[in-house]
A protein has these predicted regions:
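N-terminal capping/lid subdomain adjacent to the active-site entrance of alpha/beta enzymes
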Residues: 2-244, 249-258, 262-266, 386-411
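Short, small-residue-enriched loops and turns at beta-alpha junctions
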Residues: 193-195, 220-226, 248-255, 273-281, ...
Length: 411
């Protein structure tokens, strides 16, 4: 393997207008997706691409933070960097001139997500393999060397992480069939808040014809009866065998979340997502108790492994919606996946990357650590902007074959 040295860090502030109504929910009403893009230029000509999602003008703040945070990477050889990436990740996260802005959350952590994802993309490209294969080819020791386990050692220590990976190494072949069958998806794009019922029905029928069997609807309207009418329409349209989820995007206080959760529970959802403020662990504990048997899903706004640990320890979540564009990238996503495995919880990522990177990570999670196969969220709105958009057909994500993490953007 020849040396692949990072020569320069380039940054792109990418904004994409969405079709009217797309991307809207109870809190976020603008139809725009933005990506804070890190580009690692190497001496061999490879370009490592990393992304973090935002929804508007704040994207430039993340780009500014990338410029400040990524400076230590220039001049580093990618194999040497990734051989002990956990140490570098902690060094960047604890930069003494920037840590005060977090720590481990907000603009600086989103910047670290983009930088980290670019490192993994460059690493996979330099080896000529897709990210899922690069990760599966690593030994348990090499995987653990990628991780910053600080502040979660009380639950998953280095020896615990190694034990999980080693325990599932002997029977990995039995799970590799997922690479041929593909990973099941669920469709979020049918149920945006601004869509009227006719639009939802039209998109549902299209998604069903494309092989999807699970669908998410945005709730948290100022008109609660509208939420209930839309929920009834969704359940009627997909039938008793279809799977539905409801997403409030943090709109309700605890009292409203309990009341509306009970009403929406009549439509037998797989989960109720982000029912209240994403930092309120105690409120989620109460909701998990009061809304049973309805399950609680959250994670897209949980910024780090420590808060995920707290949610899991408290029994405040049933479905873990970690996002490698919100966490500190691929490496912290793997750490959260190990935490979830420890607590027996499934990982169903929020796709701030539109599923591009997460498809690799779920193939890895299932094969390497025996994570249950459930669903990967599908949001197709940026497909035309990716050089290698995720291959989705028959309601499944099919295994990516191109080298890298699938987040190259068309310039």
């Amino acid at each position: 393997m020849s040396n692949c040295v990072i020569e320069a860090v380039l940054i792109r502030d990418a904004h994409y207008a969405l079709p009217p109504g797309a991307g809207t929910d109870s809190v976020h009403i603008n139809s725009e997706y933005c990506l804070a893009v890190t580009l690692l230029k190497s001496c061999q000509g490879f370009l490592g691409t990393g992304i973090a999602l935002t929804l508007g003008e704040g994207n430039r703040l993340v780009c500014d933070a990338i410029e400040l945070l990524a400076r230590p990477l220039v001049g580093m050889e990618i194999e040497e960097l990734m051989a002990d990436f956990g140490t570098m990740s902690r060094r960047l996260a604890d930069d003494p001139s920037l840590r005060w802005l977090g720590p481990h959350k907000g603009v600086v952590h989103l910047a670290l997500a983009s930088i980290t994802n670019a490192c993994f993309d460059l690493w996979a490209k330099s080896r000529g393999v897709p990210l899922w294969k690069l990760l599966l080819d690593l030994s348990p020791e090499q995987v653990v060397a990628l991780l910053d386990l600080s502040y979660v050692e009380d639950v998953v220590s280095r020896s615990d992480a190694l034990a999980i990976l080693r325990a599932h190494a002997c029977n990995r072949a039995a799970r590799e069939s997922i690479l041929h069958s593909g990973y099941p998806g669920y469709d979020t794009s049918v149920g945006w808040m601004a869509y009227d019922n006719d639009k939802v029905r039209q998109l549902l029928d299209k998604a069903i014809s494309e092989g999807f069997r699970a669908f998410k609807l945005k709730v948290g309207s100022t008109d609660e009866q509208r939420d209930l009418r839309r929920a009834a329409m969704l359940r009627e349209r997909v039938g008793d065998d279809g799977i539905v989820m409801f997403d409030a995007n943090q709109h309700w206080n605890l009292e409203d979340a309990i009341r509306m959760g009970r009403e929406l529970g009549k439509f037998k959802p797989l989960w109720l997502e982000e029912p209240t403020h994403p930092d309120d662990v105690r409120a989620h504990v109460v909701l998990a108790r009061e809304l049973a048997p309805v399950k609680i899903a959250t994670g897209e706004h949980i910024p780090n492994r420590v808060l995920f640990k707290n949610f899991m320890q408290s029994g405040a979540m049933h479905f873990v919606q970690a996002d490698c564009t919100r966490l500190a990238g691929v490496s912290e996503f793997i750490t959260v996946s190990l935490l979830a495995k420890r607590f027996g919880l499934p990982i169903l990522p929020h796709v701030g990357d539109m599923g591009q990177i997460h498809q690799h990570l779920l193939f890895f999670n299932h094969i390497a650590m025996g994570q249950e196969v459930l669903f990967l969220e599908h949001i197709p709105h940026l497909r035309e902007h990716f050089a290698f958009p995720a291959k989705v057909s028959g309601g499944r994500y099919h295994t990516p074959t191109e080298p890298g993490a699938s987040c190259d953007l068309k310039i």
